[in-house]
Regions:
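Single conserved hydrophobic/aromatic residue that forms the stacking wall/gate
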Residues: 1-10
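Short, flexible loop segments at the rims of nucleotide/cofactor-binding pockets, characterized by
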Residues: 11-15, 63-67, 85
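Conserved strand-helix element at the start of the C-terminal RecA-like helicase core
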Residues: 14-19, 24-50, 165
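Short coil/turn segments at beta-strand junctions that form active-site/ligand-binding loops
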Residues: 31-32, 59-60, 84-86
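Long, largely alpha-helical accessory region at the distal end of helicase-like NTP-driven motors
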Residues: 32, 170-180
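Conserved helicase motor "Helicase C" RecA-like lobe of SF1/SF2 P-loop NTPases
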Residues: 34-68, 75
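Conserved beta-strand scaffold positions in the cores of enzyme catalytic domains, especially
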Residues: 61-63, 138, 172-174
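Conserved RecA-like P-loop NTPase helicase motor core
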Residues: 66-167
Length: 180
């Protein structure tokens, strides 16, 4: 069973309907949006490519991974700091900590984790205020692959993140979306 669960979890990042939902969400949001992913080849690159096809030049799309040199990461940060029509598709490892972009208005956890510190640091990217900004919206995409009494790991991790959001007194709303 552990092996099966792991395979299901990895397959989520390559689910076309799930990725289409994330792409449509990011494309429809107003302001700068940070899309955080875990797997570069399996998830980050497909999200980036699909976003480029979807927005067709109406927004600037940036891709950041561990292979992106620091100078280019800084350039993305500066551009996003000066403009408000960007989507940054970044790996958790590169943009979850140490990045200061007060103009981030939306964060999408495309492949969230259960780590409290990592999640709070990632949310912190959007909590930095700038003139005219009062809040940041977090879209925590969780997958319910439950079957009978079995609960998948990503759903369990989502439950743990909800506990964190409650502890931190974040206002949140759960919206169920059927993507099939």
């Amino acid at each position: 069973p552990l092996r099966r669960q792991r395979q299901m979890c990895i397959r989520d990042s390559t689910n076309d309907a799930r990725n289409k939902f994330i792409v449509n969400l990011a494309a429809d949001l107003k302001g700068n949006t940070l899309v955080l992913y875990q797997f570069v080849q399996k998830h980050g690159i497909p999200l980036y490519e699909n976003l480029n096809n979807k927005v067709d030049g109406s927004k600037d799309i940036w891709f950041v991974s561990g292979d992106t040199v620091v100078k280019d990461r800084e350039k993305v940060r500066e551009i996003a700091g000066d403009t408000d029509n960007n989507i940054i598709v970044a790996s958790f490892g590169t943009f979850s900590t140490g990045i200061n972009i007060p103009s981030i208005e939306n964060i999408i956890f495309a492949s969230p984790s259960k780590s409290k510190i990592r999640n709070l640091q990632s949310i912190g990217r959007g909590l930095r205020l700038k003139e005219g900004k009062e809040s940041c919206n977090l879209y925590d995409v969780a997958d319910d692959l439950s079957w009978k009494s079995w609960k998948n790991h990503t759903l369990k991790h989502f439950s743990e993140r909800l506990s964190i959001y409650s502890e931190e007194k974040f206002n949140y709303k759960i919206v169920e979306v059927n993507i099939n």
